[in-house]
Structure formats: C-alpha cells, structure tokens
C-alpha cells in the first residue's frame, strides 16, 4: 500500500498538500505539531479539516518544548507580529529549528507506519523570511533521515517552486479552492479564511488569490507546465 505522511498545520499550504496527497496515495496520515503556537485555534482547524477530508489517521504531537527554546512572535503572545526584518535578517515570526524538528518527527512516524513519503508545504517563496523552507535544506534533511534510519524515504515538496497564485491553482486543480479559501487558517492574527488582510501571511495569500482569480487560465497553464517539467 502506498502511504504518505503530510505535515499538516491547517493552513493554506499544508491543506493544499493534503488534498493533493489524498488524490495520489492509498493511505494518507496527517501529523500536526502543538508547539505552543500563538493561536490554539490552529490545532482545532487542523483537526476539523483532517476529519472532513477523511485522512487515515491524524496525529497531534506535543512539542511544546520548542516554545521554551525558540523565541518568536508565533510562540509568544507578548511579541507583536512585525512586517520588519530583525537585525539577523529574519522576521520575528521565524521559529528556529521548527522544520528541523517537524520533519524529524514526521520521519519517525513514517518509519513506524511503513510510509516512504513525507509531504510538507514549504516553498522557496518563503525563503526571504524562512531559511528552513529552502530546497537545499529539505534535501539535506531527507539525506539525514535516510542515513539515520537506514530506510528509503522521500520528502516531497509540491509547492517548492510555485508562487502563491500557482498554489491557489493547485488547490483548484484538486477541487479544493473553496475549502482552502474558507476553512484554512493562515493568518498570524488567528482569523480563519481570508484572515485579517494585514499580516505578512494574509498579504501574501490575498495577492496570490487575486492574481489567480484574475488570470486563472494562464496561471493554471503555468502550474501544469511546472508539473510536467518536474515529472521528467
């Protein structure tokens, strides 16, 4: 049986990855991490979506230790989310080590259930703010997991080379545009759906959606072209 584990936050990107995986794999597991994130609603949204979409299993894992180690506006209520980059060149919403931890734990979970594919929604679009969303980071993590567990394992990143408009196109391609738009939580201020419209995450989401809706045919064609190139 072809199994996959999706790292799932209940946001736009991971939900798009999840609906795509459900169309491609025999058995799909979702894993969500409780790291003391700013908005507890994120976990509830993920649980509701996992149930609605009918995943084989949804694991919510307690990793609140990360909250103690990683100081970020996403883990501390007293740190306002800022659009500005800090002195280190990163936004204060960056949680150091988050994707290292998440992919490691997802790899362990995949090992236990006999899955050889992990799917995560990271993409180079986010590289300006998040170094652990880079393609070379994911490849390094993939190599480390394979060597460390002596097991064939592939980390898939369906969004890696897509812009936000193409990510919306991917949701539409999998008949989930409205679900992703209305039921996911991407907003740093904890508002489901279209969000607050002001935080960096909402801004990126809104610009991408408007671009897709205004240029649907061209952007879908661009997505399909990238998919064909990736499959060669």
UniProtKB/Swiss-Prot annotation:
InterPro entries: QueC, Rossmann-like_a/b/a_fold
EC numbers on record: 6.3.4.20
Binding site for ATP: 8-18
Catalytic activity as recorded in UniProt: 7-carboxy-7-deazaguanine + NH4(+) + ATP = 7-cyano-7-deazaguanine + ADP + phosphate + H2O + H(+)
Family: Belongs to the QueC family.
Free-text function comment from the UniProt entry: Catalyzes the ATP-dependent conversion of 7-carboxy-7-deazaguanine (CDG) to 7-cyano-7-deazaguanine (preQ(0)).
Protein name: 7-cyano-7-deazaguanine synthase
């Amino acid at each position: 049986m072809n199994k996959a584990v999706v790292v799932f936050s209940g946001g736009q990107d991971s939900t798009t990855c999840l609906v795509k995986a459900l169309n491609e794999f025999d058995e799909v597991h979702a894993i969500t991490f409780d790291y003391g994130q700013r908005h507890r609603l994120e976990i509830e949204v993920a649980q509701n979506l996992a149930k609605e979409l009918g995943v084989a299993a949804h694991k919510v894992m307690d990793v609140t230790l990360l909250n103690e180690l990683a100081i970020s506006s996403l883990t501390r209520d007293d740190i306002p989310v800022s659009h500005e980059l800090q002195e280190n060149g990163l936004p204060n919403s960056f949680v150091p080590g988050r994707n290292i931890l998440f992919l490691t734990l997802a790899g362990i979970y995949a090992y236990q259930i006999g899955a050889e594919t992990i799917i995560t929604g990271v993409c180079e679009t986010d590289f300006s703010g998040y170094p652990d969303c880079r393609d070379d980071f994911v490849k390094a993590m993939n190599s480390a997991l394979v060597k460390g567990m002596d097991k064939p394992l592939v980390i898939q990143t369906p969004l890696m080379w897509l812009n936000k408009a193409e990510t919306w196109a991917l949701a539409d391609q999998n008949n989930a545009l409205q679900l992703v738009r209305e039921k996911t939580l991407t907003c740093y201020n904890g508002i489901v759906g279209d969000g607050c419209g002001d935080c960096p995450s909402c801004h990126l989401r809104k610009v991408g959606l408007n671009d897709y809706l205004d240029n649907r045919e061209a952007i879908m064609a661009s997505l399909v072209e990238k998919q064909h190139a990736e499959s060669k």
